[in-house]
């Protein structure tokens, strides 16, 4: 165990947990990194002193926690509040007559489709020589003969 060292004048005391570590952030996590262990023999010494894997993982955690906290704060700042205006009942729109509107739409579509189908229809083509046959019949029967065969409509006595 390390002996507690006295605080220097330039240091500020940070809140610590029961194991002597500063809190990572205000949210509780179900996991924590292990405290740094003394470096094994043959460990590299850097300008900042010996580095252990658990110390690096703690520093990485602290950095990631800072990044996550900054990003969540930034997201909260960008969040917009949405309030729906209250409409007085006198200005509220009347409920539409959905069934009648659907029936009207259906009948309109149906009539337009029927008109399109009728417009696309054409008379069937006459068989070869059919036109000549019709002209011959009209000539033989004569235009006046057809009129002679017509009957007069009955007269109404109302």
Curated annotation (Swiss-Prot):
Keyword Cell membrane appears in the UniProt entry: no
Keyword field contains Repeat: yes
Region (Disordered): 1-53, 78-97
Gene Ontology terms, MF aspect: GTPase regulator activity
Compartmental location: Cytoplasm
Key words, A-Z: Cytoplasm, Phosphoprotein, Repeat
In-chain residues carrying the UniProt-annotated modification Phosphoserine: 33, 37, 54, 57
Biased composition range(s): Pro residues: 33-42, 86-96
Domain GoLoco: 60-82, 102-124, 130-153
Pfam hit, one: GoLoco
InterPro entries: GoLoco_motif, GPSM3, TPR-like_helical_dom_sf
Domain of life: Eukaryota
GO biological process: immune response; positive regulation of cytokine production involved in inflammatory response; positive regulation of inflammatory response; positive regulation of leukocyte chemotaxis
Phosphothreonine: residues bearing it: 60
Gene3D superfamilies on file: Tetratricopeptide repeat domain
Cellular component aspect of the GO annotation: cytoplasm; plasma membrane
Biased composition (Low complexity): 43-53
Domain notes: The GoLoco 1 and/or GoLoco 3 domains exhibit GDI activity towards GDP-bound G(i) alpha protein, but not the GoLoco 2 domain.
Function noted in UniProt: Interacts with subunit of G(i) alpha proteins and regulates the activation of G(i) alpha proteins.
Protein name: G-protein-signaling modulator 3
Organism: Rattus norvegicus
Gene designation: Gpsm3
């Amino acid at each position: 165990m390390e002996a507690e060292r006295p605080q220097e004048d330039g240091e500020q005391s940070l809140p610590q947990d029961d194991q002597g570590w500063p809190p990572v952030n205000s949210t509780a996590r179900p996991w924590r990194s292990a405290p740094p262990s003394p470096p094994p023999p043959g460990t590299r010494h850097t300008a900042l002193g010996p580095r252990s894997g658990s110390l690096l993982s703690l520093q990485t955690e602290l950095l990631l926690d800072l990044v996550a906290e900054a990003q969540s704060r930034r997201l909260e700042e960008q969040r917009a509040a949405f309030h729906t205006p209250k409409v007085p009942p006198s200005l509220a729109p009347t409920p539409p007559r959905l069934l009648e509107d659907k029936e009207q739409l259906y009948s309109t579509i149906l009539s337009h489709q029927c008109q399109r189908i009728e417009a696309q229809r054409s008379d069937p083509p006459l068989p070869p020589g059919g036109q000549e046959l019709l002209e011959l019949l009209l000539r033989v029967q004569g235009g006046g003969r057809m009129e002679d065969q017509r009957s007069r409509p009955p007269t109404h006595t109302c």
